[in-house]
Amino acid sequence: MAKIILDENKLLYADNRKSWRAWLKGHYRTGREVWLVYYKQHTGKARVTYNEAVEEALCFGWIDSTVRRVDEDRYAQRFSPRKPGTPYSQANRERLAALIAKGKVAKEVLATLGKPAPKRFRVPPDILAAIKADPAARNNFRKFSPSYKRIRIAFIDGARDRPAEFQKRLRYFLRMTAKNKQFGFGGIEKYY
């Protein structure tokens, strides 16, 4: 597989949330993309956390996507303006609800949001049946936090129009849940 070389002119290092927000504030209207640099832990360099980076990006109508290795000490994640009309993930709806309540979302962006607030959460019947069919998964699922359940189930359900991907996500979730293991990013718990 060919190694992807990142354009050094599009790399941005923000050592904290405030500097990342300042960059977004100055570029969200005209910027097309930026690769936010995260230094690896062994370097000891300060950095904005993933959750902070996503929250600030949402405040300015941007979203996160691909992650690429830069070198031995760094990796970078692509951020770009969100395409109008694309749906928000469950995690981002929950983040946005909290950010709106705190008055952090830019007014221009707020006017375009519509209603990104969290939807009432229900486990789809087919996913619930799959969980119930595995006694270990069923028992462990009951113990997981409501936020974790919402995020993971929404992720699985988001692939419903791609049956192979839907099944792959569901099988992985069931396997991990049966082992009583949670996976994915952290930090979302603070919204509850």
Residue ranges and their predicted role:
Residues M1-Y192:
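Charge-dense, helix-prone N-terminal extensions
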